[in-house]
Design a protein with these regions (language model features):
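Thiamine diphosphate
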Residues: 1-136
């Protein structure tokens, strides 16, 4: 990241070139998704959960650091106790379309974990795929 850029600028800039590392790019990705949906006329949110011990273990710290900005864009981060519980929590957000009145047109779910955690989370991941998601 250039010394002339701070993280607030990097996360808020919507045109031109930005320079950031991989973890910050994942944080930025959440904002870009919600902004893209907004430009399409949709009111969406995002739910992110994962395990702190994953290879992207600093993602949780970066999301917590930007929590105020993320909440302003309807992006909620919840630490997972383990990969299985985190995957199940994300799956829950994808069932919004099956209940009555919703606050959002859709919720994007983002899960992260490590390889053994993927094995452990098989049921949640399979059932989430079988259940499907809402239109947005």
């Amino acid at each position: 990241m250039s010394s002339k850029q701070n993280l607030t600028t990097v996360f808020n800039k919507e045109s031109g070139e930005i320079h950031l590392g991989g973890i910050d790019a994942l944080v930025r990705l959440t904002l870009d998704q919600v902004r893209t949906d907004e430009r399409r006329g949709l009111k969406t949110g995002m739910f992110v959960s994962g395990y702190r011990g994953s290879p992207v273990g600093m993602l949780d710290a970066a999301l917590i650091k930007q929590q105020k900005l993320l909440l302003e864009h309807n992006i909620k981060f919840v630490d997972g106790l383990n990969e299985d519980l985190a995957a199940t929590a994300v799956w829950g957000t994808q069932m919004m379309h099956t209940v009555g009145k919703q606050k959002f047109d859709g919720v994007t779910g983002m899960w992260y974990g490590k390889a053994p955690g993927v094995d452990r989370s098989g049921d949640a991941l399979k059932h989430a795929n079988y259940t499907g998601i809402g239109k947005n």
